[in-house]
């Protein structure tokens, strides 16, 4: 009886130490891209195994503190900040995913949304990432590959919009023709 209690206590201690050890060595990385409407980029990317979270927001502009009101995001692009575990999903897998979920042949906007704020771009932190993105881009890609700049999260009501407002989100996505065009590109 005492031996079994001792063994159970040892197993519990080992389990706690294992959890502490794993959490102290787990890490994440980030990746930013623009692919049109951030509701869609967030929805398309958040479901990938190894993606911890996706935050909708703005990047690559000069307007201080952009907001989601017409004209108040200035020259920023809508973007997704992807927080991921590189032990579970590689950066090259994420980059390939981006090219499958954007219209890489259109740099004037995406689908029904037009203008710079909806235009695609993929951002890099260093030369390795820049070269990796370039090597994975489809031959017909016109997507700019740019240095990462400050990211500004959008208001909470726009985070996880596809989950909070599924009817409106799905209507918008269908009306915009996003999936129809992606099916054409990814034949």
Predicted features, each with a name:
Residues 21-23:
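N-terminal signal peptide c-region/cleavage motif recognized by signal peptidases
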Residues 25-187:
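Flexible coil/turn and secondary-structure edge motifs
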Residues 4-14:
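Bacterial N-terminal signal peptides that target proteins for export
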């Amino acid at each position: 009886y005492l031996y079994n209690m001792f063994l159970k206590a040892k197993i519990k201690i080992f389990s706690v130490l294992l959890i502490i050890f794993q959490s102290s060595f787990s890490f994440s990385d980030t990746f930013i891209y623009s692919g049109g409407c951030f509701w869609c980029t967030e929805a398309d990317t958040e479901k990938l195994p190894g993606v911890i979270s996706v935050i909708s927001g703005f990047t690559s502009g000069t307007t201080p503190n952009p907001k989601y009101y017409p004209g108040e995001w200035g020259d920023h692009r809508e973007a997704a900040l992807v927080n991921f575990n590189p032990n579970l999903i590689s950066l090259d897998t994420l980059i390939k995913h981006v090219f499958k979920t954007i219209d890489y042949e259109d740099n004037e906007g995406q689908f029904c949304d037009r203008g710079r704020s909806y235009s695609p771009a993929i951002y890099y932190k260093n030369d390795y990432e820049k070269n990796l993105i370039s090597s994975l881009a489809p031959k017909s890609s016109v997507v700019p590959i740019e240095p990462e700049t400050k990211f500004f999260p959008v208001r909470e009501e726009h985070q996880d919009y596809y989950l909070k407002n599924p009817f409106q989100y799905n209507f918008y996505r269908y009306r915009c023709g996003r999936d129809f065009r992606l099916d054409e590109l990814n034949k």
